[in-house]
Amino acid sequence: MQNQKIRIRLKAFDYRLIDKSAIEIVETAKRTGAVVKGPVPLPTRIERFDVLRSPHVNKTSRDQFEIRTHLRLMDIIDPTDKTVDALMKLDLPAGVDVEIKL
């Protein structure tokens, strides 16, 4: 796997989980001899929802809710077979979504 790059994109609602997972991936990749760029924090996506408090009247009275989606981007440059095997065996928390592109 020479002159290749693995791009890993992490997505989660909790920034503590995503940072912990990113550190775990970086340590695993470095331990197997690969070069890691990142984790790079991408802009947090904030979705806001306005909901009426009352079912009938009082349109001006509303509750506001938001969901924050945190993103991290990492590049693993020149990965070995050992690196790929170690990353596949890695056990990450359930709240972290992982996208891998070769």
Swiss-Prot record:
It comes from the Bacteria. This is Small ribosomal subunit protein uS10. The gene is rpsJ. It comes from Nitrosomonas europaea (strain ATCC 19718 / CIP 103999 / KCTC 2705 / NBRC 14298). Keywords: Ribonucleoprotein, Ribosomal protein. Part of the 30S ribosomal subunit. Involved in the binding of tRNA to the ribosomes. Pfam families: Ribosomal_S10. Belongs to the universal ribosomal protein uS10 family. Gene3D superfamilies: Ribosomal protein S10 domain. GO terms for biological process: translation. GO terms for cellular component: ribonucleoprotein complex; ribosome.
